[in-house]
Amino acid sequence: MRPEDLDEVLGIERASFSMPWSRGAFLYEIQQNRVARCWVMRDEERVVGYLCLWEVSDEVHITNIAVRPESRRRGLGRTLLGGVLDDARQRQIRLVVLEVRPSNTQARTLYESFGFRVVGRRRGYYYDTGEDALVMENDLQTARPGTRA
């Protein structure tokens, strides 16, 4: 992700989340946060999705993933997440963690299809609604048969 991608990224972010990240938050991640990495996915002309993460030691924490609303249900989120997990495996990352709203069943289904499992709950995590966050993790060292984990 580059600063010149941010207008499109912010459009996707605002269309995807009730608590969108700001331009400043994305700029911090791509310019100053030494543990952050962010990618964009493009079609021929535009950004169609993105993913941001933090990498610390042998763990990855996925902080943000979204796909342009009109491009959803085409496997783009699956491609983004799969690419990150493949990269993590190659670099011998042990654990991938993320938070998700319990009400976000589409995202949960995607994560579960890659071998993520619920390991905890953060009470009142989403301040806009007070909804909890489910903490999901994927232990890349103990992948289960039939998953990409």
Where is each model-derived feature located?
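Conserved catalytic-core motifs of GNAT/GCN5-like acyltransferases
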Residues: 99, 112, 117-134
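Accessory recognition modules or surfaces
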Residues: 78, 131-140
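Short secondary-structure capping/turn micro-motifs that flank functional sites
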Residues: 29-30, 104-105, 127-128
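Acetyl-CoA-dependent GNAT
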Residues: 3-70, 81-91, 120, 139-149
